[in-house]
Amino acid sequence: MDRGRCANMLKSLQRTLAKCQKSPSTNHWQCFKRNFTSIRATKYPGRSNSTFHYWPWFAASTLLATSLYYRDRPVQNDDKTDAFPSHTESIQVDSSVSDFPLTITALNFPVSTTFKLLGYGQRHVTFLRFKVYALGLYLAENDENLVSDTLNETYLHKYFLDVDDSKTPKENLARLLKRDDSKSVMMIDDLLDSGMRMLAKITPVRNTDFKHLKEGLVKTISKHPDVANNKDTLAKGLSELNDAFSRKGSVRKNDDLIIELLANGALQFSYHDSKNNEFEVMGVVNNQLVGKFLFSQYLCGEKSPSPQAKKTAIDKLITLL
């Protein structure tokens, strides 16, 4: 392509971009569409030298239009710090699926007790941040006291040497949970060993299947830092997981996979068909490492499947110290 024509093309697009950014209208994408139609496209010879193509214009303009389009679209809950709105019964985790309830009970889900929302976020894959599912992490209402009973001043001075005496025990514990990945893993694992019951609600934002959901769980569990020290025991647990997750077929967007961590460390899997509002208990994994490693990965460490869910959950846990 001729350098002069390329330069003119880019200048025209730059002028269009600048004009739309300065437009009093809040929708820069609409501004771009109006102005781009008035720009006269320049023809460029293709490789055959016999056919003319508009592809350079379309390539550059598509990139520009895409950036303006996504600039105007609201982003839901990607970096929220005010995680839990007051006076509501649910919260939007992703705009493409139903809101998540702040409370889950045995009246509306196949669970053993009442759970309160602890943290939430989205699961992304690849560097393009391709969204896979919305995730809600819940803590059993009757187990909230286990947080302060386990992570207290005695625990702090027993296991950690780098305590800042100018800070309160709660401030020191909060610092370790939020800023030290290795120590946060130890603290969360100790919390889970206390018998703390938890629940994960996974809601796909696009159609998927049970195989992909199971593979995702196995990958998450396998990234726990203590896997190498527990290979044989964990292998048996993953075999149990495969049996409990034996259902095949598709999972529609907005259906739910409910994973409940029971007091004895077992995991119960349930499936919610949101279209027909039907529930199915799929199976139970009794191997305690599977549940412990899964929820530990959700709550801490470098390789959490949803950093936003981890952050909001840890922030909430700190308020319970």
UniProtKB/Swiss-Prot annotation:
<dbReference type="InterPro" id="IPR036298">
    <property type="entry name" value="Chalcone_isomerase_sf"/>
</dbReference>
<feature type="transit peptide" description="Mitochondrion">
    <location>
        <begin position="1"/>
        <end position="72"/>
    </location>
</feature>
<dbReference type="GO" id="GO:0005739">
    <property type="term" value="C:mitochondrion"/>
</dbReference>
<protein>
    <recommendedName>
        <fullName>Altered inheritance of mitochondria protein 18, mitochondrial</fullName>
    </recommendedName>
</protein>
<dbReference type="Pfam" id="PF16035">
    <property type="entry name" value="Chalcone_2"/>
</dbReference>
<dbReference type="GO" id="GO:0016872">
    <property type="term" value="F:intramolecular lyase activity"/>
</dbReference>
<keyword id="KW-0496">Mitochondrion</keyword>
<dbReference type="InterPro" id="IPR016087">
    <property type="entry name" value="Chalcone_isomerase"/>
</dbReference>
<keyword id="KW-0809">Transit peptide</keyword>
<comment type="similarity">
    <text>Belongs to the AIM18/AIM46 family.</text>
</comment>
<dbReference type="GO" id="GO:0020037">
    <property type="term" value="F:heme binding"/>
</dbReference>
<dbReference type="InterPro" id="IPR016088">
    <property type="entry name" value="Chalcone_isomerase_3-sand"/>
</dbReference>
<dbReference type="GO" id="GO:0005743">
    <property type="term" value="C:mitochondrial inner membrane"/>
</dbReference>
